[in-house]
Amino acid sequence: MSKKKVVIALGHRALGTTMPEQYKATRNTAKAIADLVEAGADVVISHSNAPQVGMIHTAMNEFSKDREDYTQAPMSVCSAMSQGYVGYDLQNAIRAELLKRGVYR
């Protein structure tokens, strides 16, 4: 029998709108994902990054306002940065939860 495949899509604000909210949300999400993994499912995760990309874009543009040697960051760069840090938070939360449960796969 083949494993059950589960796709999890974390929507627009599922991971919060601030860094502390995201930290808490990724830990809570990791628990649910670990439950699925323990049950034998193959899990694929997709996530939105709208609040996070907005925070990064604002921060980068504010930083560059009074500095002639810095240009404003394009939205595509900010999006890549936010995808990386959201993925990093999810990865760390899921890894920690699985290790806590003794799941090593």
Where do the language-model regions lie?
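Ligand-binding beta-strand-loop-alpha-helix segment within the catalytic cores
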Residues: 63-105
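N-terminal glycine-/serine-/threonine-rich phosphate-binding loop
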Residues: 1-51, 55-65, 74
